[in-house]
């Protein structure tokens, strides 16, 4: 059932693919059909939506304006289909979300597993992104939901759930600091440090701690990957800084130790679940929200 113009769907496909031919392949239709719909849409709007470049198609200024509207239309269409299916007792639908990399280790597999137990016909798409990228993906309607740590307040985002987690130093069990109940950044400064770059929210959390430490802090390694930072720490190449989320396997196998960080008191990071402000959630997405919210609250409670 189509409840919107094919031109809308074709425009979105071309935007994502970057070419008419690739969009047609993904849609399983003829290239001429896609091109015809794009030309028709441009004629109706009276402006080019794409710049035709040798390397492919690039959104024009008008195309960028239309993109957000199209994403919202497609989301609303999915919500309507989901609600109609729910009236018929059909547990189908699609959930698209973006999440920070650290949630891929254990959190997301747990949530997705519980979701599919009760909604086996729901399809889930996950896009991994940095904390600085996630708000735009949610606001622009590219995804239904975002999961990220310590996002700044944004009037275009609505926070559905939040949990607080201790930020800590991550080291091997034989590290000189491993036996501490807590550490300050100054305690860690005598060892090689593994720091996140500005793409991860941890960087912003660490900045005032670095200032308060009163010591020059020069990381041995900067990275935009939690997985890499974790692996570097596991190879005993330095001290990484993160929450316990994403370290579940290493902590249970005792290959890494998480030591709570102190800076004028405990240091916390917040894991939040977000949607676009004033949006309506399809039935399947709402079900996912309930499962993810329960998991966030459970883990925050276990954190103590």
Predicted features, each with a name:
Residues 107, 257-301:
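A late-sequence structural motif
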Residues 178, 192-213, 281-290, 295-303:
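Secondary-structure junction motif
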Residues 154-193, 283:
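Flexible hinge/capping segments at coil-to-helix
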Residues 42-59:
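A short LG(V/I)-centered, amphipathic sequence patch enriched
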Residues 92-155, 222-223:
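Central regulatory/effector-binding core of bacterial HTH transcription factors
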Residues 12-30:
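Short helix-boundary/capping micro-motifs
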Residues 130-135, 139-143, 148-149, 199-259:
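Hydrophobic hinge/microswitch elements
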Residues 155-161, 165, 180, 227-277:
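Beta-alpha-beta core module
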